[in-house]
Amino acid sequence: MARRLILGYQSYLSPLKMGPTCRFEPTCSNYALIAISRHGLIKGSVLALGRLARCGPWHPGGWDPVPPRRPLCSWGGRRR
């Protein structure tokens, strides 16, 4: 459902703007698609909302990739 909403935005609303307006690469909508597919709906949506909060004239923009997925077990094994 979230993916369809983002794709709908990209197909129907985004072209109505005069030229590219996102100051980031990947664009905020592509970032949201990647974040949701990589991290799941909840964490991906939180990451996408954080990106949207940074997307404004006060931020220089630039390359801002979706962070990699971290393993559930960061210490690599069973505790002894």
Curated annotation (Swiss-Prot):
Disulfide bonds: none
InterPro entries in UniProt: Membr_insert_effic_factor_YidD
GO cellular component, one term: plasma membrane
Location (main, coarse): membrane
Keywords associated with the record: Cell membrane, Membrane
Record function comment: Could be involved in insertion of integral membrane proteins into the membrane.
Family: Belongs to the UPF0161 family.
Protein name in UniProt: Putative membrane protein insertion efficiency factor
